[in-house]
């Protein structure tokens, strides 16, 4: 699978790359602005700075470097790129997801399976006037933002970034805390089991024996406050720590302020990357309206249409049964030709068994493909067609993106603006669309279409009925 290599840094990116001063630096930017490229170049030069410190005798042992990514797929992609940036026997490099990094470093109880976690929350919240999906998301938000001894702060806190609907007055928050969250915490202890929030808390409480001199956290908008606290607890007294993020692409319920995790972030140690180097003007114009009514924060960056340097076809919406949708996909891949070296991502909101027909049709057509979802290693062979969930495509980029089967069944939510699940799905769709460099195709069956179709600007796409 082709990795799209970093290009020469721009003058805008060089202001970040050439800032070697120890401390925290935050890189913000919209999809396609080169955030990860900038972070990797910055990593290269900051590691050189620390290598000089090592050679000059200011630090003992190797320069310890940690790169944390959002998921396994992105970890494999970043590792493939980072290998080219970091040289030298005096560097100890770790590239990992937060979960893998944490489970390698703390003794832990078994991690709850998703069905156990969700089943218990659903049972505890049955009497609340809230949907199951919202309760799960809100509980994850609370347990990710507040440490176990400060959970009551949730009752009066500002829930910025959590949407305007459903409303959560203090009385309902108190019920959620008393009837769901506290009993859930007690139940986990009885089961001698943890969830991912417990892992973050354990890492935040454990002082590392081998702290890191250099840390890069990519896609940091989907890290929880407690995960950030854990990272801060595992750096040397003098360190270089880089967070790379865009809150407009947040697809998990994490929202906190830098101040509440003990960091001061301002113009002196942050940079907004405004230019879009990835998308054509047409793809950026399609993605931008999806975020128009989505609640944003200071860390969000909306795609800048004026900065796109390339023109292309409008995104294409293909209407038909799933069989007809796949007819179009197979024809598109065949039209690229056997010698094609352009990368293609076929994305779905759910993955798993939902990809069964996609795989069967590609196999029947003799078209090779590779899976990307939860793959820890980036596939290095010649195959350039990848299957992935929309979530796992985060942080990646491809020449062509095809989002298949966009239905109300796989992306259910309330229809009113401000609904938290609707906002999350719009961010997910905009993020997925922003993975495409050249073409974007979305397929769906009109009678089962997701309500998100209505959020798209008709002037920004073409329609093909098959």
Task: Give short role names for the model-derived ranges.
Residues 108-175:
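ATP-hydrolysis module of ASCE/P-loop NTPase motor domains
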Residues 6, 11, 25-56, 62-63, ...:
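Conserved helicase motor core of SF1/SF2 NTP-dependent helicases
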């Amino acid at each position: 699978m082709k990795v799209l290599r970093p290009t020469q840094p721009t003058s805008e990116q060089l202001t970040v790359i050439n800032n070697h001063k120890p401390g925290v630096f935050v890189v913000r930017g919209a999809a396609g602005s080169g955030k990860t490229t900038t972070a990797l170049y910055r990593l290269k030069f900051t590691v050189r700075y620390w290598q000089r410190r090592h050679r000059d005798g200011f630090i003992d042992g190797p320069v310890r470097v940690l790169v944390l990514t959002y998921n396994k797929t992105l970890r494999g992609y970043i590792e493939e790129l980072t290998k080219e940036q970091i040289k030298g026997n005096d560097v100890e490099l770790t590239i990992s997801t937060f979960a893998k990094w944490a489970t390698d470093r703390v003794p832990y109880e078994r991690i709850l399976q998703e069905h156990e976690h969700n089943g218990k929350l659903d049972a505890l919240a049955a009497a609340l006037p809230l949907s199951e999906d919202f309760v799960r998301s809100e509980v994850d938000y609370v347990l990710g933002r507040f440490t176990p001894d400060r959970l009551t702060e949730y009752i009066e806190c500002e829930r910025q970034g959590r949407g305007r609907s459903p409303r959560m007055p203090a009385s309902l928050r108190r019920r959620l805390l008393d009837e769901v969250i506290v009993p859930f915490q007690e139940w986990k202890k009885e089961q001698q089991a943890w969830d991912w929030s417990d892992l973050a808390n354990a890492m935040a409480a454990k002082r590392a024996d081998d702290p890191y001199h250099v840390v890069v956290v990519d896609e940091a908008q989907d890290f929880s406050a407690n995960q950030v606290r854990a990272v801060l607890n595992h750096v040397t007294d003098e360190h270089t720590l880089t967070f790379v993020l865009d809150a407009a692409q947040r697809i998990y319920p994490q929202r906190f302020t830098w101040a509440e995790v003990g960091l001061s972030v301002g113009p002196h140690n942050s940079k907004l990357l405004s230019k879009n180097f990835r998308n054509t003007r047409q793809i950026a114009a399609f993605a931008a309206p999806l975020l128009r009514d989505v609640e944003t924060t200071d860390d969000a960056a909306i795609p800048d249409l004026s900065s796109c340097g390339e023109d292309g076809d409008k995104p294409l919406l293909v209407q038909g049964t799933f069989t007809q949708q796949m007819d179009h996909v197979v024809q598109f891949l065949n039209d690229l030709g056997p010698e094609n070296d352009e990368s293609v991502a076929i994305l779905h909101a759910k993955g798993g068994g939902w990809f069964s027909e996609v795989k069967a049709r590609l196999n029947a057509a003799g078209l090779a493909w590779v899976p990307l979802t939860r793959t820890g290693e980036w596939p290095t062979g010649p195959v350039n067609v990848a299957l992935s969930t929309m979530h796992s495509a985060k942080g990646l980029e491809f020449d062509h993106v095809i989002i298949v089967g966009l239905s109300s069944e796989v992306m259910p939510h309330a229809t009113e603006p401000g609904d938290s699940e609707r906002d999350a799905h719009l961010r997910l769709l905009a993020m997925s669309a922003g993975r495409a460099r050249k073409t974007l195709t979305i397929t769906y069956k009109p009678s089962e279409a997701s309500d998100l179709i209505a959020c798209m600007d008709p002037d920004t796409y073409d329609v093909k009925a098959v």
